[in-house]
């Protein structure tokens, strides 16, 4: 059960290790990505210049991006709108509705999309439960909001169990 729900298909150090070339090899046409601690620190209001370049590179290669966040409308809108990136706020991840809505909005199929995030309990669990290819990234910041701090404690236990069972091939 742990493996089925909590083991991501891929693990990368950060979003910048996900390139259009690698995505094209998998025939990926769409990205559903978390915002806080995946793209930028949870308390950073705007995208970094490097992240803006990453978004532009995806767009140039025809890869659509939608931000799906459990955060509130104000936070997600203030970050996403200046970039012209579609978004879904209060997504209620790991529930699947927001993931599926993002795919419909991008006019793609589930098989054409990946889910990227920094949390096992929201991003990976939600993506895996709903049949998406999942990519776990190391959190951008070492600090978290209150609820996420609790989730991280649970995640450490899950990762430890997956590692003991030989399912994890990377170093944390």
From Swiss-Prot:
Presence of keyword Signal: no
EC number per UniProt: 3.1.3.-
Gene Ontology terms, MF aspect: phosphatase activity; phosphatidylglycerophosphatase activity
Gene Ontology, cellular component aspect: cytoplasm
Enzyme class (EC, first level): hydrolase
Pfam families the record matches: Hydrolase_3, Hydrolase_like
UniProt KW Hydrolase keyword: yes
General function of this protein: Has low dephosphorylation activity on GMP and glucose-6-phosphate.
NCBIfam families, A to Z: HAD-SF-IA-v1 (TIGR01549), HAD-SF-IIIA (TIGR01662), YqeG_hyp_ppase (TIGR01668)
Descriptive protein name: Probable phosphatase YqeG
Organism, scientific name: Bacillus subtilis (strain 168)
Gene: yqeG
